[in-house]
UniProtKB/Swiss-Prot annotation:
Ribonucleoprotein as UniProt keyword: no
Induction note: By light.
Gene it is expressed from: IF2CP
InterPro entries xref list: EF-G-like_DII (IPR053905), IF2_II (IPR044145), IF2_N (IPR006847), P-loop_NTPase (IPR027417), Small_GTP-bd (IPR005225), T_Tr_GTP-bd_dom (IPR000795), TF_IF2_bacterial-like (IPR000178), TIF_IF2 (IPR015760)
Name of the protein: Translation initiation factor IF-2, chloroplastic
Organism the protein comes from: Phaseolus vulgaris (Kidney bean)
Compartment(s) of residence: Plastid, Chloroplast
HAMAP family: IF_2_B (MF_00100_B)
Record region (Disordered): 75-132, 147-294, 319-340
Lineage, highest ranks first: Eukaryota, Viridiplantae, Streptophyta, Embryophyta, Tracheophyta
Amino acid sequence: MLILVGSKQGTMSSLASPVSLGSLMGVSSSGRSHSGVRRVSFSRGNCKGRKRWHCLSLSVCRYSVTTTDFIADQGNSVSLDSNSNSSSSSKSGGDDGTGFVLKPPPKPVLKAPDNRMTHLGPSRTTGDVEERNKVIESLGEVLEKAEKLGSSKVNGDKNNGSVNKPVRNNANASPRTERPVNSAASLKSKTLKSVWRKGDSVASVQKVVKEVPKPSYNKNEEEKSQTRGGEKVVSQTRAPQPPSKPQPLKPQQPSKPQPALLSKPSIAPPPVKKPVVLRDKGAAETSVKSKEKKSPILIDKFASKKPVVDPLIAQAVLAPPKPGKAPSPGKFKDDFRKKGALAGGGRRRRILDDEDVIQDASELNVSIPGAATARKGRKWSKASRKAARLQAARDAAPVKVEILEVGDSGMLVEELAYCLATSEGEILGYLYSKGIKPDGVQTIDKDMVKMICKEYDVEVIDADPVKVEGLVKKREILDEDDLDKLKDRPPVITIMGHVDHGKTTLLDYIRKSKVAASEAGGITQGIGAYKVQVPFDGKTLPCVFLDTPGHEAFGAMRARGASVTDIAVIVVAADDGIRSQTNEAIAHAKAAGVPIVIAINKIDKDGANPERVMQELSSIGLMPEDWGGNTPMVPISALKGKNVDDLLETVMLVAELQELKANPDRSAKGTVIEAGLDKSKGPLATFIVQNGSLRRGDIVVCWRSFWKGRALFDDGGKRVDEATPSIPVQVIGLNNVPIAGDVFEVVESLDAARERAETRAESLRNERISAKAGDGKITLSSLASAVSSGKLSGLDLHQLNIILKVDLQGSIEAVRKALQVLPQENVTLKFLLEATGDVNTSDVDLAVASKAIIMGFNAXTPGSVKSYADNKAVEIRLYRVIYELIDDVRKAMEGLLEPVEEQLTIGSAVVRAVFSSGSGRVAGCMVTEGKVLKDCGIRVKRKGKIVHVGIIDSLRRVKEIVKEVNAGLECGLGLEDFDDWEEGDIIEPSTQLRRRGPLKRPQHQWQLLWRE
């Protein structure tokens, strides 16, 4: 271990450096023998101001042994092979200049130590390899310091007494080139590491202590410079470099005889502008770190204003906040100019403006200069973009049509206004000018549309009527991918016909159930789907039967049944023949393109005539097979089950000829047969799968509704996990009640189903508005009534508000169509709410606010809701038969009309003579018909003209006052304000009657002859 001992100022006063460990040195006491330098010290001599290097002890070292010269204090080089007095003089440390100092190595240039004393204490020697490697690194640092001091002395640099940090040697430099030439260990350099690891006793060396005590500096010591040998030495600073492995130093010749060999010529670095502040190792690292944290970021003022990194992020990275409570947001004081600015600066604003221009151009479909991706000059201003948007809006404005197609149902006001390129206000203003006061959304009938379009010079043509048969077009469900995977499926059979012809009774016999007995009024008011096992050809095959209602109000239900069916069974009563709904059912089946099988029912009743029924069917194009046609007709008795098996066999034969197939391995597609709202299960619907398989957990979209399969139920109410083709199932868990007749299909994800449902729901907005029965429809008849309302008494327009609650979605459609048939010239119907489910308190509140009545069709009312309605004085009427509902609505509409007063003629009399009395002239009359009553009104006619209208003041018979005189009797009567009687005048007595106003405006009205 090397120990450097300096002066009291802590600096080395001699230009020397310790030699490499193991350098040979001649000792006079031993003649020409050589010993290795084991310890070198730099001690203070007796003379003041003199410092020397001394070789304290010598021993032979097997590591990097070489011959090194000593350099005297005055610069004289003395070889180690000199006499012993040289050695002794070096030890004595006198002022005679005979002391020896070690020659510096050539490369590293380090600062001289401070004038203060640097004490390096000895360290304990250890035997492990890591400790020795650290010793070598410490020795290398010390040797580099000494080498720099020697180099600065030779080059004449000035020294200010400061000590620099050790400089790391080049890691790529080869240690062989710098190894001493005469080293005794050069022959064993390859095995040097292994020799060192073996722990040779000679290799025990003292370790240099790296931690140097922190000296205290003052300003005078920093600025103080010292001279040695007539030359001023100035300290030089270099950037700190990472430490490198120690390398052996190359021997150097004495300076005087061979000055070029002392060290390699070095170029002094340029002087540093700022004064060097000396700190210890720890202080230097702290200074560097703090400088890096607080160093400013240099930005070119001509560069982009947008920072590469967000200033807030950069500030957080450069100066992370201390742990603790963070400042509350919004308390930073920003410059008032920057408050409204964006975080990204001006360029960010320009980019956003460009995006706005591009977006405007894409939305408005106009060409805006500068809206391209590349910036080319100044963009459009805000005013220019606004002008472009206005121009695009004008271009997209509706254009008045020249020819308008109108159906029988009329048009909405907003739809008509769009077609005429005008506003709804102008249309409504025209209606106001004609005496109509529209309330809310109005539907204008076809005649009124023609009148309005005539004002705008628009031609109106009649559109083709949309028939219910259009709903029964059979949908093609199969795809091209299914053709190779088709399998047989059960047939779907729909039972259709007129009401009370025995459709449900036939199905009850087939299902062995009693459905007809449980139906209200004995009529079907909804579609029932059932799966039945039918024996055929020695085996049992599944069939699906659909029971449709036969009432005229349920035509759409029959159409839906025909659209999904494979075979239509038309039931005709043998004692009743073909009726209106029979013809409609046949038309639906023909429109759907399905085969028809006729079941002539009730052949066991008296008066049954199957031959007459077959004759009637042949007259409408259905020729029986027995008569050479192609329509199977089977006489049956559904009540007793006669010939029902023959009917089923005929149906299965027809189904076999059709070769009904489907692909059960794909996702399901089908049709909604019926839908409703259950108070315990929520929205529910009956699906019939037409292709694929519907499984529990599938995601289904059905027009404006979607469903993630929670549960599937068969026709018996049992849970099932899968529904194969042609199988009807009931599903629960829908987001809302779907529309009966819609097509459903399975989609991949719930998000896709929700998106499609919302899009389709928006497209049905107008249909939902126009679905209200009698939603203020304006017709020419109502217009005429409104115009004449000021002249004719007894007529006025009223409105009946109804809240309808039903059990099934299809029932809403049926009830609405049935009520639309009622005349609405004087009283209009307005359905405020049409929904499925039971009556609730919300319905009662709506009825209170709108003065409406609540009608339930196959719906129930909880007891609490009924009590709540009674307290609110709201009437709730529940029905199970549609006939009763229609009759009550008619009576309610008539009750809104004002009673009409009419004059009814009750008799006739002829004036036979005229008498004078004290009260005036009195007419003697003969009652020819009817009777004459006292205080009744009369009309006096003379030669066919009415000359007076008044009231009988007095009535006498043979001088007795009476109240009435019957026909064939004579009487005398007098009037209070009339006495100009003549013989032959005809008197017509009449009485005033009050009756309920008619729903339909009468063709004529009687003029009131008198008023009380």
